[in-house]
Amino acid sequence: MESVERVNLLGLDGAALSELVGQWGGKPFRARQLQRWVHQRGADSFDAMTDLARDFRAQLARDCVIEALPVNTEQRSSDGTRKWLFDVGQGNAIETVFIPEDDRGTLCISSQAGCVVNCRFCSTGHQGFNRNLRASEIIGQLWWAKRVLEAAADTARLPGGKAGEDTRVISNVVMMGMGEPLLNYDQVLPALRLMLDDNAYGLSRRRVTVSTSGVVPMMDRLSQDCPLALAVSLHAPNDALRDELVPLNRKYPLNALLAACERYLAHAPRDFITFEYCMLDGINDTDQHARELIQLARQVRCKLNLIPFNPFPASGLKRSPSARVRVFAQRLMDAGIVTTVRKTRGDDIDAACGQLAGEVRDRTRITERNATRTIPIQQVHA
């Protein structure tokens, strides 16, 4: 007799879970109860769900599972940053990073194993593309991290840990890990909906950010299906340079990208788009580039996030000197462009923005790769 694959409940958003429970004759409130057990309480056993009927739990045990990806390693930085390496099979892995700050806790999650966009400055792209992640594997990163962090948390040190305030460990999620989220849209969408669902993680639309290299048609779909904070990997102020740094620009050039950003803003929870700009020595960091970037930024409501490049041997690129980054940022601010600079985090555990390569076979090259995790922490100019 052929066995039937059991349904992984981690990958079902509220509508899909209600449909499943309805097929068994269950009421919608049962689906909500089940969703809270899985995502809010972090249950991985149906026996623990004591307020559900015994026959319902038996049905769940027969037909369903609650399974995240296997964890190969966990690393902790001296600055509090934590990283998990999840096994996706065939010797490949994805990486998930938690960045604690005084006023928030941000989880950076992956949407693909590898990436097809192949941005020149990103080591993930240099690793090639393995496969899309399933919705259960995407939300499973949040599910796992929430369980681990909450189990170990000292309440007095949680973000927002004052009396009467939200004391959740993970207050923000950014889809800025491995992969291009909008090229895995059908699996990313239910994961995003779960992040926002009050019966699951209950995050604000302003606190969930999708970062895209500029997949214009899917930006339009996201604005209709699940509008939330959007970051665009810009990295160049003109098409000629962006064609070289972000090859997707050859399909969706800057004029199309900026128009899509303007359309997105009509539905977005924030009144601006974040443009990410990796600072590359002698490549995109000159005064002329700053002038071009100012003209581009004035075409859409945005803020600029300047990212120090984290070198890796295959790129052939170098990080812009700190003094050059400061001058570049000041020029933008003097022109009235809101600008932030990211601070490096987790450099001792190889947890870098644009550097998540998910290596399983060789985890010993941390010094060689010299990667750093970066997060936005300061405004350059008030």
Swiss-Prot record:
Offer a single GO CC term for the protein: cytoplasm
UniProt xrefs under Gene3D superfamilies: 1.10.150.530, Aldolase class I
State any single GO MF term: tRNA (adenine(37)-C2)-methyltransferase activity
Q: Does the keyword Nucleus apply?
A: no
Give the encoding gene's name.
Answer: rlmN
Remaining remarks: Reaction proceeds by a ping-pong mechanism involving intermediate methylation of a conserved cysteine residue.
Instruction: Tell me which PANTHER family the record gives.
Output: 23S RRNA METHYLTRANSFERASE, RADICAL SAM CORE DOMAIN-CONTAINING PROTEIN
Q: Radical SAM core domain spans which residues?
A: 101-348
User: Where does this protein hold S-adenosyl-L-methionine?
Assistant: 179-180, 211, 233-235, 310
Q: What's the top EC group for this one?
A: transferase
Q: What is this protein called?
A: Dual-specificity RNA methyltransferase RlmN
Q: What is the cofactor note? A: Binds 1 [4Fe-4S] cluster. The cluster is coordinated with 3 cysteines and an exchangeable S-adenosyl-L-methionine.
Active site (record annotation): 95 (proton acceptor), 353 (s-methylcysteine intermediate)
State its role. Specifically methylates position 2 of adenine 2503 in 23S rRNA and position 2 of adenine 37 in tRNAs. m2A2503 modification seems to play a crucial role in the proofreading step occurring at the peptidyl transferase center and thus would serve to optimize ribosomal fidelity.
The catalytic activity, as recorded, is: adenosine(2503) in 23S rRNA + 2 reduced [2Fe-2S]-[ferredoxin] + 2 S-adenosyl-L-methionine = 2-methyladenosine(2503) in 23S rRNA + 5'-deoxyadenosine + L-methionine + 2 oxidized [2Fe-2S]-[ferredoxin] + S-adenosyl-L-homocysteine; adenosine(37) in tRNA + 2 reduced [2Fe-2S]-[ferredoxin] + 2 S-adenosyl-L-methionine = 2-methyladenosine(37) in tRNA + 5'-deoxyadenosine + L-methionine + 2 oxidized [2Fe-2S]-[ferredoxin] + S-adenosyl-L-homocysteine
Q: Is Iron-sulfur there in the keyword field?
A: yes
- Its EC number is 2.1.1.192
Pfam families referenced in this protein's UniProt entry, alphabetically:
Radical_SAM (PF04055), RlmN_N (PF21016)
Q: Where in the cell is it found?
A: Cytoplasm
Q: Which cofactor does it need?
A: [4Fe-4S] cluster
